């Protein structure tokens, strides 16, 4: 996955009032934290953050920070992004500093590949798990995990344990949890007028 640059500025003041002022000026408050360091409050451009996490892979892009206070050149990933529930705009971001020599746990999107036999037979595809948690080195984070549904028939499911692991990537979670299923045909009952 490609690395992207994210400009940040150190924040000396914190609180609701400062956060509101930042948002009015198209900036959002954030914090950078990680192993062996104190949390550092920062602010960053809303547009720049949206651009940095746009596209497939989203929040899992490796971001190189540019800014003062010893943050210049630090590698981070978006640990949490709070968004306005009505507008969908970012309100706060947590950036997790990562060590390239340590494995990280991230959630990646599931990409369904192929046309399921069960769907062709009239079944209904139930895509239950859109993201899967994995563990790998930061340079091995995939944009998505492909799951082939071609052979899936009515009444059958693919579980986390059925996902083929890629080299250097460990799929986490309960192996018995369903990722995708093919449900049986739905019978339509005639509508009876009263």
From Swiss-Prot:
- List the GO molecular function terms: 5S rRNA binding; structural constituent of ribosome
Q: Which species does this protein come from?
A: Geotalea uraniireducens (strain Rf4)
Sorted alphabetically, which keywords does the UniProt record give? Ribonucleoprotein, Ribosomal protein, RNA-binding, rRNA-binding
Its name, as the record gives it, is: Large ribosomal subunit protein bL25
Q: What are its GO biological-process terms? A: translation
The cross-references to InterPro entries, in alphabetical order and at most eight, read: Rbsml_bL25/Gln-tRNA_synth_N (IPR020056), Ribosomal_bL25/Gln-tRNA_synth (IPR011035), Ribosomal_bL25_b-dom (IPR020057), Ribosomal_bL25_C (IPR037121), Ribosomal_bL25_long (IPR001021), Ribosomal_L25_dom (IPR029751), Ribosomal_uL5_bac-type (IPR020930)
One GO location term (cellular component): cytosolic large ribosomal subunit
Q: Does the keyword rRNA-binding apply?
A: yes
The UniProt subunit note reads as follows: Part of the 50S ribosomal subunit; part of the 5S rRNA/L5/L18/L25 subcomplex. Contacts the 5S rRNA. Binds to the 5S rRNA independently of L5 and L18.
| Function of the protein | This is one of the proteins that binds to the 5S RNA in the ribosome where it forms part of the central protuberance.
The protein's matches in Pfam families, at most eight in alphabetical order, are given as: Ribosomal_L25p (PF01386), Ribosomal_TL5_C (PF14693)
Query: Transmembrane ranges?
Result: none
Q: Which gene encodes it?
A: rplY
Show the Gene3D superfamilies listed in the entry: Ribosomal protein L25, beta domain (2.170.120.20), Ribosomal Protein L25, Chain P (2.40.240.10)
What family does the database annotate?
A: Belongs to the bacterial ribosomal protein bL25 family. CTC subfamily.
Lineage of the source organism? Bacteria, Pseudomonadati, Thermodesulfobacteriota, Desulfuromonadia, Geobacterales
